[in-house]
A protein has these predicted regions:
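Hydrophobic, aromatic-rich transmembrane alpha-helices
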Residues: 37-48, 114-122
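Membrane-helix interface segments
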Residues: 20-21, 50-55, 126-132
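Small-polar-interrupted transmembrane alpha-helices in polytopic inner-membrane proteins
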Residues: 60-75, 130-144
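Membrane-interface junctions
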Residues: 15, 30-34, 47, 51, ...
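Alpha-helical membrane-inserting segments
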Residues: 41, 66, 70, 74, ...
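Interfacial segments of alpha-helical transmembrane regions
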Residues: 41-70
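N-terminal transmembrane-helix/juxtamembrane module of multi-pass inner/ER membrane proteins
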Residues: 1-37, 70-102, 191, 209
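Membrane-embedded catalytic cores of phosphoryl/pyrophosphoryl-handling enzymes
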Residues: 94-204, 209-211
């Protein structure tokens, strides 16, 4: 029953198409178009966090890798056919430019990656306008995959949840690392180079006593 609803909702979204939105959704679903956005996020984080940026960048790279590879792993485990590869739907699916993608579609890698970026970045930026904007951006990316005929709504929803979980988990791991490792290391470095409480004169006084 749930699968039937998923298919019906897919057909409703996929059939509500036009030449204009075909071009818009195809463009939104591309990867290179969003490179300026990713660069803008990194620049903002670099300005805001300065010395911590390198550590943050490492966590961002780890999160992106985990999101992408985990979605591929789930695809190969579940092996749910994309709607455009489903024999019972192939004839009615509206495909833009005839592009269907790989055989399996659960979960959507686009949705996983987009919500990973959204959740991880909004946890660092912490601005209401940004939170709303980046979540809407990720949702539109997910919607475009349904519109283009390459994913069911269920693929996108579950991919979104997976990506959001990965983004939140990596931010939590960063906070834990920053609190328990980086700050302790900074404290150790400060105390290890701190001069005696008496200052340089204390050495002279000690020498005099020995004389």
């Amino acid at each position: 029953m749930l699968e039937q609803f998923d298919q019906q909702l897919f057909l409703f979204i996929n059939s509500s198409n036009s030449q204009f939105f075909d071009n818009v959704m195809y463009a939104l679903s591309g990867r290179l178009i969003w490179v300026p956005l990713y660069l803008a996020i990194l620049i903002f984080l670099g300005i805001k966090y300065k010395r911590k940026f390198l550590i943050i960048l490492i966590f961002i790279i780890l999160a992106a890798t985990l999101a992408d590879q985990s979605s591929v792993l789930v695809k190969n485990i579940v092996q749910r056919l994309r709607p455009c590869h489903n024999p019972s739907l192939m004839s009615v699916v509206h495909l833009v430019k005839g592009e269907c993608g790989g055989v399996y579609g659960f979960v959507s890698s686009h949705a996983t990656n987009s919500f990973d970026v959204a959740l991880l970045s909004l946890m660092f930026i912490k601005k209401r306008w940004y939170t709303i904007s980046i979540i809407l951006w990720a949702a539109v990316i997910g919607y475009s995959r349904i519109y283009l005929g390459v994913h069911y709504p269920g693929d996108v929803i579950c991919g979104s949840l997976l990506g959001a979980f990965i983004g939140w988990s990596m931010y939590s791991l960063y906070v834990l690392t920053d609190k328990n490792i980086l700050k302790d290391k900074a404290y150790f470095n400060q105390t290890s180079i701190r001069p005696p409480s008496g200052g340089p004169d204390s050495f002279r006084e000690g020498d005099r006593k020995q004389e």
